[in-house]
Amino acid sequence: MKYNGIMQTVYEAAGGREGLLRLASAWHARVLEDEVVAHAFSHGYHPQHTERLAAYWAEALGGPTTYSEQYGNETLVVRMHSGNGPHEEMDQRAIACFDQALLDAGLARDERLRRVLHDYFAWATTTTMSRYHDSAEDVPDGLHIPKWSWHGIVRGAEADDI
């Protein structure tokens, strides 16, 4: 997506930090209301969950590396989501909550932005966050937050250039 002839990152097009904070807040509110997805939060969650989630998404979508610098790496995030067995219904409902949160946060007006954000969240939910069903101890050390651009997952050295 271009703004004044300059290519924007998905992070910028989503409204930067403020846009992703709105999205994280809207998604969190929706999942807490969903009878299936809310189970993932039934044992409590970090008091700054929304801010941390927005920082994670920001880093993945071409924004600042605040999450990795202040909170942890991909290994930590994947371990938090691992060891719970398969949960396809929960994943699909979390994605549906995300799609509704895009509307709530005002990020669904631009179809290209809506689609890329949906694709990112659906990919992350059904791959990186649900890869280790048996045990969080199976998650390898040293994982980096995957980067996502307008064209999908960014592989290799170009991940630092989005």
Where are the language model's segments positioned?
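Surface/interface-facing alpha-helical segments and adjacent flexible terminal/loop regions used
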Residues: 13, 74, 141-144
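Short, Lys/Arg-rich amphipathic segments at extreme N-termini
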Residues: 8-15
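Short, contiguous alpha-helical
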Residues: 123-146
